Amino acid sequence: MITTQEIQQIREQIRTWRTKGETIAFVPTMGNLHLGHITLIKEAAKRADHVVASIFVNPMQFGANEDLDAYPRTLEADKLALSDAGAELLFTPTPDIIYPKGMEQQTYVEVPKIGDQLCGASRPGHFRGVATVVCKLFNIVQPDIALFGRKDFQQLMIIKTMVEDLSLPIEIVGIDTIRETSGLAMSSRNGYLSTAQKSQAAVLKQTMDQISSAVKQGASLDLAIENGKQALIDSGFTPDYLELRNAKDLSLVTDGQDELVILAAAYMGNTRLIDNLCFTR
C-alpha cells in the first residue's frame, strides 16, 4: 500500500489507473479504525478495481469544546489494517495541506436544511466541516464510488445530497452499521467508555428496537419516543435527541409515510454516542 500526504502523488497514481480503464473506490476516515471501517474497505474492494482510503482528523468539523485534541490517532496500526483489508493507496494529509489558507479563509460547502437539524443543531458548523472536507477529498481522489457507514445516517444523507446538488459523478453507497455483540454500534469514540459504561450503552440499540416494535404495533409516535427517552435516562444516558423521521429525507413524519428512521444521540458520561434504526411501520 502506498501512503502519502501529497495531493500530486495521489493524482498521479489515480491517473495511472485511469489510463488503464480501471475503477476507483474511496473510503474516507478519521483513523482509529475499527471493524466497521474495515468492512467498508473490504466492500469497496468488491466494487472497484482499486481502493483508496484517507485518514484525516478534520478540525473543521469539531466544535470549540469538542474532542479534536483528544481524538485517538493510531496511524501505524491503521495502515496495517487498511493494507490487510485491501486498500492500495492511503492519503494522510495534514490540516495545512487541506486548508493551506487556514479554515477562516477556506471556501466551504454547506447543505442547507438537512444539515441544520438533529446533529447539525447540536453541533453548529459540524456538517459544514464534513461537507467541505468530503468535497475536497472527492476532488482530489475523483473516485467512481465512495462508501460510508449507515451509523452516521444524517451524514450519509448530507453527502448524497451534496453529490446530487453539485452534479459530482460519484456513486455514494451506504453500508450497514457494524455492531458489537451487545448491539452497541462500533465507533471510534467507544474507546472513551469504561467497561461499565460500555455495557450500559448497549441500551441505546435496545431502546430503538423497543420504539420500532411499539410503532409497528400501532403505538403513538410521541408516546413511543417519550418512553424511549425515559428508558435512556433510566439507564444512565443523558439524551441529546431521540426522534422519528422520514427515512427518505429526514422530514417530520406525517400520515401515510411508512419508511421511518429512529435517530438517537445521547451522552454516556462525557461521551456522545449516535445511532439509528430504519424500519417500515
From Swiss-Prot:
Family listed: Belongs to the pantothenate synthetase family.
Keywords recorded for this protein, A-Z: ATP-binding, Cytoplasm, Ligase, Nucleotide-binding, Pantothenate biosynthesis
Location (main, coarse): cytoplasm
Quaternary state and interactors: Homodimer.
Catalytic residues of the enzyme: 37 (proton donor)
Enzyme Commission number(s) from the entry: 6.3.2.1
Protein's gene: panC
GO biological process, one term: pantothenate biosynthetic process
Binding site for (R)-pantoate: 61, 155
Misc note: The reaction proceeds by a bi uni uni bi ping pong mechanism.
Keyword Nucleotide-binding: yes
Cellular compartments per GO CC: cytosol
Binding residues annotated for beta-alanine, in chain numbering: 61
Reactions it catalyzes: (R)-pantoate + beta-alanine + ATP = (R)-pantothenate + AMP + diphosphate + H(+)
Subcellular location: Cytoplasm
Domain of life: Bacteria
A Pfam cross-reference name: Pantoate_ligase
GO molecular function, a single term: ATP binding
Role noted for this protein: Catalyzes the condensation of pantoate with beta-alanine in an ATP-dependent reaction via a pantoyl-adenylate intermediate.
Pathway the protein acts in: Cofactor biosynthesis; (R)-pantothenate biosynthesis; (R)-pantothenate from (R)-pantoate and beta-alanine: step 1/1
SUPFAM superfamilies with a match to the protein in the record: Nucleotidylyl transferase
Full protein name: Pantothenate synthetase
Amino acids binding ATP: 30-37, 149-152, 178, 186-189
